[in-house]
Amino acid sequence: LKIVEDAAHASGSVYKNKKIGSHGDAVCFSFHPAKNLAMPSGGLIAINGKNIKKSKKILESKRWVGISNRVGSKYNVSNIGWNYYMNEFSAVIGIEQLKKLESANLKRKYIAKRYSEELKMERKIPLRKDCSYHIFWIAVNNQKEFMKKMQENNIETGIHYLPIHKMKFYNSKVKLKIT
């Protein structure tokens, strides 16, 4: 059994007292200006194993092809995709951002704690000290009203993650009747 970690939104997070990316045979990181490791779009795959040369050849021939019809924060997954190309410009920015990752994540944790304390909701997702809080997620009953009130207070909101079975690529393959 091979383990591939998805660390796209978890730069700096910890699981079982170890940094994300140190548990499996490979780990995939995804970069974007709005993510914890803020840099131009791209990604990185780190492979821990004997067949690195074989894996490297396969991976080098791939590029990002999965997301289609993106408008703002709305998108659909219509095919399998990759996003792990890297150029020198992005790498230099990433190296500098890596130096700031811990302090930036501490600030995110502070903001998440404040949101958790200040937002009066019946259902809350528990705060975790090992989470890097790429995004602070909540569930509300009246989404439009909530988003309007947040906007009135200059707080940006968005709907970022649709359930996977509602995306084109997966909806014919997976039926999740209780979601």
What are these language model-derived features?
Residues 22-60:
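Active-site PLP attachment segment
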Residues 7-9, 33, 43, 65, ...:
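Short, flexible active-site-adjacent loop segments at beta-strand->alpha-helix junctions, enriched
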Residues 17, 43, 179:
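Conserved phosphate-binding and hydrolysis motifs of nucleotide-dependent enzymes
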Residues 21-22, 38, 84, 131:
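Structured loop/turn residues at beta-strand edges in well-structured enzyme cores
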Residues 1-30, 36:
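Conserved PLP phosphate-binding loop immediately N-terminal to the Schiff-base lysine helix
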Residues 4-5, 34, 40, 86-87, ...:
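Residue-level micro-sites within transmembrane alpha helices that shape
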Residues 14, 50-179:
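PLP-dependent aminotransferase class I/II
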